[in-house]
């Protein structure tokens, strides 16, 4: 791969990870401080027949995922650690979005409590695509550095 193309992918990975970090942290934080959004989230979880503990776990997962995406941007890390942190963030976001897709597909969840009132899981699937666009270059960076994952 050419140097210019590699730099372009690295730049896109950096911007997307920053965007995903800000989005996840913001929405997780809003679920904690905004009663309206928190109410919607409660309805989503309850109508999906997920356990009550999923409410707190979902909020924590969104905030922590956001922090993990932002962490490499807040401090300089070696390439080894930056790649590992981003892959953990991508894995966490993957799980959160799988739950979001599940919630969207539940017939008992009304569209009014979903983001933008959209019942099909368009938003979680789009976020999964963005997640893959960060994970693949992060994985390739680790592999090209010859750095073991374990």
Where are these regions (language model features)?
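Membrane-interface extramembranous regions
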Residues: 2-150
């Amino acid at each position: 791969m050419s140097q210019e193309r590699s730099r372009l992918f690295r730049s896109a990975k950096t911007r997307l990870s920053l965007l995903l970090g800000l989005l996840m942290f913001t929405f997780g934080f809003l679920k904690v401080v905004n009663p309206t959004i928190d109410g919607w989230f409660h309805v989503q979880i309850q109508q999906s027949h997920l356990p009550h503990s999923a409410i707190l776990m979902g909020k924590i997962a969104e905030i922590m995922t956001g922090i993990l995406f932002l962490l490499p941007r807040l401090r300089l890390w070696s390439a080894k650690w930056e790649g590992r942190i981003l892959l953990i963030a991508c894995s966490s976001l993957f799980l959160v979005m799988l739950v979001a897709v599940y919630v969207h597909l539940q017939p008992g969840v009304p569209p009014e409590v979903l983001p933008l009132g959209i019942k099909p899981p368009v938003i979680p699937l789009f976020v999964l695509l963005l997640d893959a666009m960060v994970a693949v270059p992060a994985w390739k960076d680790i592999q090209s550095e010859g750095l073991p994952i374990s």
